């Protein structure tokens, strides 16, 4: 019996997922372009370095390194097969690109775009940068401030009240509490203000959303009004209904800065401070002295929160701050222009990318898998400024409830992306042999079944793949089933080809001239082995 060798687990995934293909085509033959263009036959190539002299069929839009293990190649072909025509995929191992499918095709990236915002913010501002929200004006004399105090917004995206954090159950996030600013004013000796509490949001423009966003983004509260002085995400909580256990609803405010001043006024009154003139909008006087201030958590923690929770408001406000630092103003347009500049500095072809906003909500955004993979690698890899702050499969953020019980759990860290007709995933996987795979996957287009099945398959494939198989390598195979648990099924000594419908079984001709039987993560050219699908796969929602 010959020694075991790695196999494409993708094929068995195709079986259980019920994916069918015309008998004349292979899974890899899905063609890019306008939906409905269909598929085309790809040329047959014979590459001894790739397949040991076997004949492989390759998509002309897909390139593979000759020395890449055919198991991984076939598995990644399976990922493409599970995806709509408008899909890009790139996989690097050890900084060498091993698989590219339409990797230079510009597609809607959804929230994976946030990796660019995080990278630029950390590069331009530094991980230790803190946003500062100040109250300026005349100091108190015998507890009395004669005149106005001005609340100056510093762009803190996580400024909140303790009540809002409690109701929204976000207290575990790196929040900045407005309550602390009220405490600081009391500690500074303020007991009465004879004037007004003025709100200054002049650091950024007052465009409350991205003009090209659909109206439903605001009506569905996907993002609150944007501004340099925003508290509680720009929402006001409805009064709590006595006896109700449900959290109160929230309403979007029209003037976020004025709302912030109103909230501070409530907090001051609760501490015995009176403000004779109420609240108003305005700009702080030039040279006004600081009376009290509150600082955010370090930017590194803010970026982590943005990436883990896919926080749209944080991404948009960071984009405006990037514009301020660039010297071109606190607007979305200036921020996105600076992001493009940073991308060019990193060697990313800027003609392949379009930034209409910072969060990835806009359907006018365009990124390539090449661009995403490049920024992930050039920002320091899995332990770099972005990689170290990504959600981890089965543990944190938008991936906390995904890939549970699979080889990807704890090994995959990535940014998710989801819009109607868009699903994306980009990040890193620590493979079982210790090597790191960097990957980017974007799929655009409606899918009849679970839209995440392609990226789920990708994560599990990379999580359990070994670049070198040994005689004692035999791990349970895990197949993504679009969020449904898999019952344990024993398939005793059955050639893989016998399990497939004829159209899919034709793909096996690319593997060997003799039947192969799957055993864990490897195969042996022998009889008598069994296959156990004993591990369930669970997928979960994530932006």
Report the location of each language-model feature.
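Short, well-structured active-site flanking segments
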Residues: 123-138, 146, 276-280, 383-387
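Beta-lactamase-like hydrolase cores
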Residues: 38-106, 180-189, 193
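Small-residue-rich helix-loop
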Residues: 100, 319, 323-483
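C-terminal region of N-terminal signal peptides and the immediate post-cleavage residues
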Residues: 17-56, 130, 272
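Active-site SXXK
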Residues: 95, 109-127, 197, 229, ...
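A small/polar active-site loop signature that marks catalytic segments
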Residues: 234-384
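Short, gly/Ser/Thr-rich active-site loops of penicillin-recognizing serine hydrolases
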Residues: 457-536
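Mid-domain, small-residue-enriched loop/turn segments at the edges of structured enzyme/sensor domains
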Residues: 86-88, 144-227, 234, 273, ...
């Amino acid at each position: 019996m010959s020694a075991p060798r790695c196999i494409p687990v993708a094929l068995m995934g195709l079986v259980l997922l019920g994916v069918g293909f015309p008998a004349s085509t292979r899974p890899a033959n899905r063609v890019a372009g306008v939906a409905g263009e269909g598929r085309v036959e790809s040329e047959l190539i014979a590459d001894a370095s790739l397949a040991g002299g076997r004949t492989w069929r390759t998509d002309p839009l897909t390139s593979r390194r000759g020395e890449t293990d055919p198991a991984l190649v076939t598995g990644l072909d399976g990922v493409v097969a599970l995806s709509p025509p408008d899909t890009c995929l790139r996989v690097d191992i050890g900084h060498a690109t091993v698989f590219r499918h339409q990797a230079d095709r510009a597609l809607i990236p959804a929230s994976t775009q946030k990796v660019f915002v995080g990278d630029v913010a950390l590069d331009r501002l530094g991980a230790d940068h803190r946003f500062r929200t100040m109250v300026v004006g005349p100091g108190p004399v015998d507890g009395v401030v004669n005149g106005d105090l001005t609340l100056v917004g510093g762009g803190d995206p996580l400024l909140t009240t303790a009540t809002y954090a409690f109701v929204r159950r976000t207290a575990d996030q790196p929040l900045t509490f407005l309550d602390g600013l009220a405490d600081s004013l009391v500690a500074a000796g303020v007991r009465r203000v004879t004037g007004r509490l003025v709100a200054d949001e002049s650091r950024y423009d007052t465009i409350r959303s991205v003009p090209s966003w659909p109206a439903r983004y605001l009506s569905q509260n996907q993002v609150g009004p944007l501004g340099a002085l925003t508290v509680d995400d720009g929402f006001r909580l409805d009064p709590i209904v006595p006896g109700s256990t449900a959290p109160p609803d929230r309403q979007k405010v029209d003037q976020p800065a004025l709302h912030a001043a109103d909230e501070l006024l409530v907090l001051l009154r609760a501490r015995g401070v009176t403000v004779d003139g109420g609240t108003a909008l305005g700009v702080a006087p030039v040279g006004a002295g600081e009376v009290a201030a509150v600082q955010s958590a370090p930017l590194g923690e803010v970026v982590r929160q943005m990436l883990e929770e896919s926080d749209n408001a944080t991404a948009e406000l960071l984009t405006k701050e990037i514009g301020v630092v660039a010297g071109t103003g606190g607007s979305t347009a200036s921020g996105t222009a600076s992001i493009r500049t940073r991308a060019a500095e990193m060697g990313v072809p800027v003609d392949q990318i379009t930034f209409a906003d910072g969060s990835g909500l806009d359907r006018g955004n365009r990124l390539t898998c090449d661009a995403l993979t490049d920024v992930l690698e050039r920002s320091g890899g899995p332990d770099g400024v972005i990689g170290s702050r990504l959600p981890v499969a089965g543990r944190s953020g938008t991936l906390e409830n995904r890939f549970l019980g699979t080889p990807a759990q704890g090994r995959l860290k990535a940014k998710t992306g989801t819009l109607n007709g868009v699903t994306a995933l980009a990040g890193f996987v620590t493979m079982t042999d210790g090597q790191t795979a960097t990957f980017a996957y974007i799929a655009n287009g409606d899918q009849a079944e679970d839209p995440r099945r392609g990226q789920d398959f990708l994560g599990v494939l990379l999580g359990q793949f070994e670049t070198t198989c040994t005689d004692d390598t035999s791990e349970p195979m895990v197949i993504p089933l679009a969020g449904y648990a898999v019952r344990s099924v024993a398939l005793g000594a059955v050639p893989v080809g016998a399990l497939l419908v004829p159209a899919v079984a034709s793909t096996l001709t690319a593997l060997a001239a003799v039947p192969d039987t799957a055993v864990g993560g490897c195969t042996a050219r022998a009889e008598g082995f069994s296959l156990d699908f004993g591990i369930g796969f669970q997928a979960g929602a994530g932006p």
